[in-house]
Design a protein with these regions (language model features):
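Bacterial N-terminal signal peptides that target proteins for export
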Residues: 1-11
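Boundary/activation segment at the start of structured domains
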Residues: 22-85, 89
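Functional beta-strand-loop-alpha-helix junction segments that form "active/interaction loops"
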Residues: 59-64, 68-151
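Sec/Tat-exported extracytoplasmic proteins
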Residues: 75, 79, 130, 134, ...
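Catalytic cores of nucleophile-dependent amide-cleaving enzymes
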Residues: 148-228
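Caspase-like cysteine protease fold
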Residues: 236-265
Length: 265
């Protein structure tokens, strides 16, 4: 092999190794997992809503899923997200699972609609994920390839949307693994900072956004918080964006909305 050929081979190998080293960072996928407990007039201690919105067995019309500001409908109508998967859930507790793809980055949002009467299971699964437990795989297949998402305890951001059932009952705390990085969580439920704090401390999670009073856990607030997380904003910026979104739809005043949300401990 002459010197010129050797140099060309060396440069080709160097370029290949450089690309190989960069590829994981460029192609890494981030996952947001959202646990939605469907509103249920019969099985939850909520202020009753119209029957159609409060039927915990009917996700298509439910206040927190299929209604105008429910998670599925609101994200499906967003210009930032594309619905790529919608099927019945993997267990009887989950009536529907939807996956949304962020249009400009490799980010996926997996949302599970839990039967209203299964709110205890929804909370247990949320806290398990917050603790980094029960990681699962979800395969998304199109005509060209298969993408495997790590969900549950393997998700990068975990959120709960629904009634704060810890006002009604308690469950056994779920302990996170010591030494693991703290997982950011969003809890959109009434007065969640007070009621969820003991559980999230045991789980070893980091509260990115939660609440300090009664509120409507609708999807515009969730989207604002996730948008901030995608943009790598700090907790206070995410809190401000969430408050702006909440005030836009609830007309409660910007200061009142800001006081309704908190970040960190």
């Amino acid at each position: 092999m002459d010197r010129l050929t050797w140099l060309r081979s060396f440069l080709a190998l160097a370029i290949f190794l450089a690309v190989a080293r960069c590829s994981p960072a460029q192609t890494s996928v981030r996952v947001v997992q959202v646990y939605v407990a469907l509103a249920d007039n019969q099985h939850q201690g909520i202020v009753p809503v119209p029957a159609k919105l409060g039927d915990g067995d009917a996700p298509a019309s439910n206040l927190y899923w299929g209604a105008a500001f429910g998670v599925k409908t609101y994200f499906r109508g967003s210009r930032d997200w594309e619905l790529v998967y919608a099927k019945p859930g993997p267990t009887s507790s989950i009536l529907e699972r939807c996956v949304f793809r962020y249009r400009t980055r490799a980010i996926y949002l997996v949302a599970d609609a839990y039967r209203g009467s299964e709110i205890r299971q929804a909370l247990t699964d949320f806290l398990s994920a917050a603790a980094g437990l029960r990681g699962e795989s979800l395969s998304l297949t199109n005509n060209r390839s298969t993408l495997v998402l790590t969900i549950g305890g393997g998700a990068d951001l975990v959120a709960y949307v629904g009634h704060d059932a810890f006002m009604d009952f308690q469950i056994e705390p779920i302990h996170g693994t010591r030494g693991k990085p703290s997982r950011p969580v969003i809890v959109l439920a009434c007065d969640s900072k007070y009621f969820f704090a003991p559980y999230l401390k045991e789980a070893g999670a980091s509260p990115l956004l939660w609440t300090t009073g009664l509120m409507a856990p609708e999807a515009y607030t969730l989207k604002a918080a996730i948008d901030g997380w995608i943009a790598d904003e700090d907790g206070e910026s995410i809190r401000s964006h969430a408050a702006e979104a909440y005030n836009k739809y609830q007309h409660c005043g910007s200061l009142a909305a800001l006081h309704l949300f908190a970040t960190g401990w």
